[in-house]
Curated annotation (Swiss-Prot):
Homodimer. The gene is queF. Pathway: tRNA modification; tRNA-queuosine biosynthesis. It is an enzyme of class 1 (oxidoreductase). GO terms for biological process: queuosine biosynthetic process; tRNA modification. This is NADPH-dependent 7-cyano-7-deazaguanine reductase. It catalyses: 7-aminomethyl-7-carbaguanine + 2 NADP(+) = 7-cyano-7-deazaguanine + 2 NADPH + 3 H(+). Its main location: cytoplasm. GO terms for molecular function: preQ1 synthase activity. The active site is at C179 (thioimide intermediate), D186 (proton donor).
Amino acid sequence: MPLSTSLLGKTSTYKDSYDATLLFKIPRINNRNALGINSNNLPFYGVDIWNTYELSCINKKGKPWVGVGTFYIPTDSENIVESKSFKLYLNSFNNFVVESVEELERIILQDLSNVTHAKVTGRIFPINTKIAFGVPSGKNIDALDIVCNNYGPPDNSLVEYEEVLVEEEINSNLLKSNCLVTGQPDWGSIVIKYKGKKLKHDSFLKYLISFRNYHEFAEQCAERIFTDIKNAIKPDFLSLYIVYTRRGGIDICPYRSTDKSYSLPSDKRLIRQ
């Protein structure tokens, strides 16, 4: 279905009964083709991590339950889920009676797997689970004194490097782009870990800032950045993790890595989540 038929950017009515058809799929292939990414031979592994903070249902006695969920959509899924449709879908459980939290978890995982055409994993937690705030790992480059005059479209010529091999981890909290349809801002903290030619931190920060007025979905921004770095420095290893702030009760955190046996970063929330 074309994106114009989705509920994104439109006035919506919240349904008071569970409805899996609310989930709206967006094929990954269109954006990947534009980036020169072969969907049958992806240059990365990883997941899109969806954290959901507005999750509720009713038990058999009519008593409401609330919780939070974390769901992992693999990068080799055929589709992603449009975020507003996911919000409306989750809220359709508000008056839905379930036997247990495990049943709710099973239903959601099955529905997400069906719409993405991949095996989605995840867990649902009670809200009294204690979670500490973390900080992005690596060296922060935001304090660099640079002059910026490009806020979009992203300029991959700014991904400059030095002819010296390094292994380093850098991060920035200055990433911002905008929803492709609504124009709402997506604020993100990004962590780049790589082994290869040394990125010039000042020009790379300018590159990240060049997304500021750009309109693209979060997952697609992540793959654009990953591709631009990979094409520029041809690293022996590269991983990218973006933690986006919460919008509509959901935050999306894409992770991409050249390492098939990757380990996910710490799941500690950052202060802006």
